[in-house]
């Protein structure tokens, strides 16, 4: 089982960061790698089971299904159903935690998956951890002035 992980401190209160990332259909509003997002079938974007269709900046497409969302816990989990990444059985969680010192937010994004093909595991772990997860955190930090 392969793993990807990134974490970051964002200089904004957890409520503001959660408000920015909570909209499951809003990834294109804050992640630089995403050009467009739509929810399939007209379902509410916070309904567990809804599927978002993402168009990447390079034209690639990914379909992801919402598995869990918690406003109280400030996190959501999702699975990739299909896309260009060399992965299978992909499950990820984006989680925020309150930092009381300075009223900041600790953000953590992690995933487990099977590399497909297996020899692409290190490459997939690096790309997901750095380009996808850390790339999103860098954009959030810039948005919040960090």
Residue ranges and their predicted role:
Residues 50-57, 77-83:
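Short beta-strand segments that buttress and anchor functional surface loops
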Residues 1, 57-59, 85-87:
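Glycine-centered tight beta-turn/hairpin loop motif at sheet-sheet or coil-to-beta transitions
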Residues 6-8, 62-68, 90-98:
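Hydrophobic/aromatic beta-strand elements that line small-molecule binding cavities or substrate pockets
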Residues 17-21, 27, 52, 66, ...:
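Hydrophobic pocket/interface hotspot
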Residues 14-15, 68-73, 96-106:
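A short, structured loop/turn motif at beta-sheet edges
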Residues 106, 112-146:
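A conserved amphipathic terminal alpha-helix motif
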Residues 1-44:
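Hydrophobic ligand-binding cavity/cleft-lining segments
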Residues 79-93:
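Mid-chain, well-packed structural core segment of small domains
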């Amino acid at each position: 089982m392969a793993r990807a992980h990134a974490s970051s401190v964002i200089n904004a209160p957890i409520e503001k960061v959660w408000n920015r990332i909570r909209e499951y259909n809003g990834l294109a509003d804050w992640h630089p790698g995403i050009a467009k997002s739509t929810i399939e079938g007209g379902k509410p974007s916070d309904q567990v089971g809804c599927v978002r269709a993402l168009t990447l900046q390079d034209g690639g497409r990914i379909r992801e299904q919402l598995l869990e969302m918690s406003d109280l816990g400030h996190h959501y989990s999702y699975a990739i159903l299909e896309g260009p990444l060399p992965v299978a059985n992909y499950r990820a969680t984006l989680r925020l935690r309150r930092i009381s010192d300075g009223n900041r937010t600790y953000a953590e994004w992690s995933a487990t998956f099977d590399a497909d093909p297996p020899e692409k595991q290190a490459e997939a772990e690096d790309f997901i951890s750095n380009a996808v997860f850390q790339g999103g955190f860098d954009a959030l930090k810039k948005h919040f002035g960090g």
